[in-house]
Regions:
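Short loop-beta-helix segment that forms the pyridoxal 5′-phosphate
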Residues: 36-40, 50-74
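Active-site PLP attachment segment
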Residues: 176, 182-218
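N-terminal "arm"/small-domain region of PLP-dependent enzymes with the aminotransferase-like
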Residues: 1-31, 160
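PLP-dependent aminotransferase class I/II
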Residues: 201-268, 273-276
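Residue-level detector of conserved catalytic or cofactor/ligand-binding positions
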Residues: 312-322
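Active-site phosphate-binding strand-loop segment of PLP-dependent enzymes
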Residues: 8, 108, 112-164
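Conserved PLP-anchoring active-site segment centered on the Schiff-base-forming lysine
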Residues: 75-94
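Conserved PLP-binding catalytic core of the aspartate aminotransferase-like
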Residues: 12, 255-303
Length: 322
């Protein structure tokens, strides 16, 4: 079966170097940590991975989580109160939505990637103490990329922080795959990044928040998913360290991804399919019919190609089926 719908963007989930690194780390450090980070769940390997992620994103510090859902769920409540404002893209991931709900800050929502609507929200939020703009780097259902340069321009104009979830963009977009800040040259203008080790970076599990040191320090003290969840297991740490080592050695994996995405898009469009144009690796094949999408998926699986049809329960109610 050929898998066409996993988030294994760089093909690392079954790479022999990662498998070997994971096995070797378990041989040395065991299967699990049996503790949260602040008791006895922090080893040198956790700090080493946090440093590798900081280096990759050109940030000051990083905090690891069990999943990016935890990173997004645990970032807002420790940092913002009823005096503040969170301004969130309407198509942000469910983990961001849930994280915002846990926080007492005033909430604003702007239409997907609509900079005029974002500016309206920023203007309305000027009375709040702190403001933060929150967006996915790549929106997972259609592959659209957030216009980070314009978002950062507005953030600077209206004195707001910026947070981006790089789950579907890190390892994928940008000249060398370093994400939306590389694509739009917004290094130093984004205050908080969240991301996952479960997509381009190996495909297993684990999440992180990376950014300014004072923000990460505060999260270490107050972020509940970090404080009350077991540390990432040594096998995950070992493989993840190998991922960042490989990405530093060569851009070959990203170059191959770009080649494959371009080939797929070109061939599908030449065959008459409607594919949304994006700069990401997500290729949404639009069928505009829920039943037809399920028929296509079933027939493809019968032919040995694994795909999934998405429709209203998983995507925005106004969006067509893919």
């Amino acid at each position: 079966m050929l898998n066409f719908c996993a988030n294994n963007y760089l093909g690392l989930s079954n790479h022999p170097r990662l498998i070997k690194a994971s096995q070797e780390m378990m041989n040395r450090r065991g299967y699990g940590m049996s503790s949260v980070r602040f008791i006895c769940g922090t080893q040198d390997i956790h700090k080493e991975l946090e440093a590798a992620i900081s280096d990759y994103f050109q940030t000051e510090d990083t905090i690891l989580y069990a999943a990016c859902f935890d990173a997004n769920g645990g970032v807002f409540e420790p940092l913002f109160s009823e005096e503040d404002a969170i301004i969130s893209d309407s198509l942000n991931h469910a983990s961001i939505i849930d994280g915002v709900r846990l926080c007492k800050a005033k909430r604003y929502r702007y239409a997907n990637a609509d900079m005029k609507d974002l500016e309206r929200c920023l203007q309305e939020a000027q009375a709040q103490r702190f403001r933060i703009i929150v967006t996915d780097g790549v929106f997972s259902m259609d592959g659209n990329v957030a216009p980070m340069d314009q978002i950062c321009d507005l953030a600077e104009k209206y004195d707001a922080l910026v947070m981006v979830d790089e789950s579907h963009s890190a390892g994928v977009v940008g000249a060398t795959g370093h994400g939306v800040s590389e694509l739009y040259n917004t290094y130093g203008r984004v205050d908080i990044y969240t991301g996952t080790l479960g997509k381009a970076f190996g495909g297993a599990l684990g999440g992180f928040t990376t950014g300014r040191k004072e923000i990460i320090d505060l999260l270490r003290q107050r972020s509940r998913p970090y404080l009350f969840s077991n540390s990432l297991a040594p096998g995950i740490i070992g493989a993840s360290l190998e991922v960042f080592k490989m990405l530093k050695e060569s851009n070959a994996l990203h170059d191959k991804l770009v080649e494959n995405v371009s080939y797929f898009r070109d061939k599908m469009m030449a065959a008459g399919f409607d594919i949304k144009p994006t700069q990401s690796a997500i290729c949404a094949v639009m069928l505009y019919d829920a039943k037809l999408s399920q028929i296509y998926a079933t027939r493809m699986q019968e032919e040995g190609i694994y795909v999934t049809g998405f429709y209203l329960s998983l995507i925005h109610i106004s969006e067509p089926t893919r």
